[in-house]
UniProtKB/Swiss-Prot annotation:
Sequence repeats lie at residues 3-7, 8-12, 47-51, 55-59. Wool. The modification N-acetylalanine is found at residue 2. This is Keratin-associated protein 3-1. GO terms for cellular component: cytosol; keratin filament. Residues 3-59 are annotated as: 4 X 5 AA repeats of C-C-X(3). Interacts with wool keratins. Disulfide bonds: none annotated. Keywords: Acetylation, Keratin, Repeat. The lineage of its organism: Eukaryota, Metazoa, Chordata, Craniata, Vertebrata.
Length: 98
């Protein structure tokens, strides 16, 4: 259920930009306040395994998240500008597709 390769995810950092971190993979989803039983993390800079910069494990926060294209109740997204980015070289590795 991981999106892209292990530890391979690139998302612009920001106060409303978080990722699910129940494991070390970049999942196909964006964590926002909801009832999804996963930990969310404030996103720190992450890099592909072949990057010269060490992978930074995000800090875990409250157990809530919202997975895109899931059956979980969606949170109120009114007024939130959300943009996601797929790191070059990871597009074809997503399963399921984002």
């Amino acid at each position: 259920m991981a999106c892209c390769a292990p530890r391979c995810c690139s998302v612009r950092t920001g106060p409303a930009t978080t990722i699910c971190s129940s494991d070390q993979f970049c999942r196909c989803g964006v964590c926002l306040p909801s009832t999804c039983p996963h930990d969310i993390s404030l996103l720190q800079p992450t890099f592909c395994d072949n990057s010269p910069v060490p992978y930074h494990v995000p800090d875990t926060y409250v157990p809530t998240c919202f997975l895109l294209n899931s059956s979980h109740p969606t949170p109120g997204l009114s007024g939130i500008n959300l943009t996601t980015f797929i790191q070059p070289g990871c597009e074809n590795a997503c399963e399921p597709r984002c």
